[in-house]
A protein has these predicted regions:
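Alpha/beta-hydrolase fold catalytic core
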Residues: 1-35, 57-59, 93, 97, ...
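Conserved HGGG/HGGXW glycine-rich cap/lid loop of the alpha/beta-hydrolase fold
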Residues: 18-74
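Active-site loop/oxyanion-hole signature of alpha/beta-hydrolase fold enzymes
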Residues: 62-107, 118, 277-278, 286
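Hydrolases whose catalytic domains are alpha/beta-hydrolase-1, hotdog thioesterase
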Residues: 111-115
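Flexible "cap/lid" loop of the alpha/beta hydrolase fold
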Residues: 117, 124-168
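Conserved alpha/beta-hydrolase catalytic His-Asp/Glu region
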Residues: 137, 160-232
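Conserved loop-alpha-helix segment in the C-terminal half of the alpha/beta-hydrolase fold
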Residues: 234-272
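Catalytic active-site module of serine/aspartate enzymes centered on a nucleophile-bearing elbow/loop
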Residues: 262-295
Length: 295
């Protein structure tokens, strides 16, 4: 299936891996350099819907739904970042991609790092992108910085014989959906745009598709040894730090991450937000193109 967007056709498909079928959206010529894009926890390939047409000029851009999210197969029990990286290596083989470039956002940057470290012959260049909190090297500090984003999803109750814990989990999901249904962009706007409603709709759908996988994925992130993994990356690497005023107290973290990867480069996007892929796609694409297309 394909949908026309800005005169560029976005195609949708599935690739079979051991877990089942992985869903993806792609744009660009089949013989263009492949570029895989991985999303954050709770999202799907839809977060790259504005970037794909822009990337299609230079790449075969492939935005995937991670296991348990979007339209991909369910996540395996007790996943690890390494196991998810293995699934991505399988997808690369299934699609017969030759050393695709890898772009990972937030959770995606952890999987991208593990993929590059564990399967160096499978990948081309690597871009690790995320807000400052997601690039912190110290595991305890990073996990504490993740708490404002993750705590609301973790249950504060025990399993019960009557199944009431399922209702409590569903109630947490409903509360999260309420926030995505009425984001600040809608509540505080002077005027409402069709794109604001479309953005809210995408966030709601993404959450409903992936709500059961968010906690297992965060647990995998909490256990992930980022410094150990990035030290093994051999690929040419860019760390793209999305700098926000709310996280200024952490100080720049991307350069510290770069120091562990031989030859890695650091770039910052100032005044960023978590939805920069959707609200400022041209700037993200410019950074990607500047790094990957450099001769």
């Amino acid at each position: 299936m394909s949908i026309k967007h800005s005169d560029v056709s976005i195609q949708y498909g599935y690739a079979t891996v051991a877990l089942g079928q992985m869903h993806y959206a792609q744009a660009g010529a089949a013989d263009a350099p492949p570029l895989i894009l991985m999303h954050a926890a709770g999202r799907s390939s839809s977060c790259y819907r504005h970037m794909l047409p822009l990337l299609a000029k230079d790449f075969r851009a492939i935005a995937i739904d991670l296991p348990g999210f979007g339209y991909s197969a369910r996540m395996a029990a007790n996943p690890t970042i390494d196991s998810l990286a293995h699934t991505l290596a399988e997808l690369i083989d299934t699609l017969a991609l030759q050393r695709p470039h890898i772009f990972g956002l937030h959770t995606g940057n952890k999987i991208a790092a593990a993929l590059a470290a564990n399967y160096p012959q499978r990948v081309g260049d690597v871009i690790l992108a995320g807000q400052t909190h997601s690039l912190i090297l110290d595991m305890k500090v990073r996990n504490a910085a993740l708490a404002p984003y993750s705590d609301k999803y973790f249950p504060k109750y025990a399993h019960s014989s009557d199944g009431s814990h399922f209702l409590k989990a569903w109630n947490i999901t409903q509360a999260a959906v309420e926030g995505f249904w009425w984001p600040s962009e809608l509540l505080n706007a002077q005027g409402t745009r069709a794109e604001d409603l479309a953005q809210a709709e995408v966030r709601v759908i993404d959450h409903l598709h992936g709500w059961e996988s968010i906690v297992p994925l965060y647990r995998a992130i909490f256990e992930f040894d980022l410094p150990e993994v990035v030290k093994r990356i051999q690929a040419r690497t860019l760390v793209l730090e999305l700098v926000t005023q709310q996280e200024a107290h952490y100080g720049p973290q991307g350069k510290l991450l770069c120091d562990l990867i031989p030859g890695a480069e650091h770039e910052q996007l100032q005044n960023a937000v978590g939805l920069s892929m959707e609200y400022r796609p041209d700037e993200i694409v410019t950074a990607i193109r500047r790094f990957l297309c450099r001769v």
